Amino acid sequence: MAQPPPDVEGDDCLPAYRHLFCPDLLRDKVAFITGGGSGIGFRIAEIFMRHGCHTVIASRSLPRVLTAARKLAGATGRRCLPLSMDVRAPPAVMAAVDQALKEFGRIDILINCAAGNFLCPAGALSFNAFKTVMDIDTSGTFNVSRVLYEKFFRDHGGVIVNITATLGNRGQALQVHAGSAKAAVDAMTRHLAVEWGPQNIRVNSLAPGPISGTEGLRRLGGPQASLSTKVTASPLQRLGNKTEIAHSVLYLASPLASYVTGAVLVADGGAWLTFPNGVKGLPDFASFSAKL
């Protein structure tokens, strides 16, 4: 069984890195990464930069991406532009893309990684809470993709990788909001792959499973997630890590996947095949509510 690559829990760069791919795989490309200031998005930015790519990392929190950009540039020697941007606001997206194009003159890759999630029964989920997740995950993915298509990809081609989930593959308790949003993004991936393929634009999804060192796992799995029977009973019997997910995204974004479009690559150690759907846990959330 292949051993996972080394990773670190927090939003810090790897102390050492061994290239599994050619070090100049993305030499002088530019990647625009939403949600790039933390978690999976941060590690994607780092791995891309370790393969020669410059990055733009965008998040609502400017202090977060400023700190992240300093770490990333210091560890990799590549350029990283931090931008404050709310994916739900098309004017903010347009301004951010314009700034990125002014800085680099091009954008070759878009990684849609901004997302929101929490546990809540459907009957206790406020209308606004459901809408908020749909706005960030689904509308946000379309907004950034649409703006980049108009401003650069339509005339120059490009690659889009949408970070989704396996929640929509079957019914999952406490996740109607995130499952619906991510399933919609997977459908969007297929539609855009069909429409934009003739402009030399590839569009794919990457669906991670439970990943250590992420805010998502802390919210959904708790501090003992790695010891959960759900994890130990999954095919690979462990959590994934952020570097593994970044490697999968690197493949999809690179020339290695030049004939891959409209696909959903699941990188979850087979977890969705064996994880229970959470119905037995519903009584524990009987008095729970979410009113964002």
From Swiss-Prot:
Result of changing D186A: Reduces enzyme activity by about 95%
Pfam families membership: adh_short_C2
Catalytic class of the enzyme: oxidoreductase
EC number of the protein: 1.3.1.124
GO biological process assignments: fatty acid beta-oxidation using acyl-CoA oxidase; fatty acid metabolic process; unsaturated fatty acid biosynthetic process
The encoding gene: DECR2
Effect on the protein of changing D86A: Reduces enzyme activity by 98%
Modified residues (N6-acetyllysine): K151, K291
This protein's UniProt keywords: Acetylation, Fatty acid metabolism, Lipid metabolism, NADP, Oxidoreductase, Peroxisome, Phosphoprotein
Protein name: Peroxisomal 2,4-dienoyl-CoA reductase [(3E)-enoyl-CoA-producing]
Organism encoding this protein: Homo sapiens
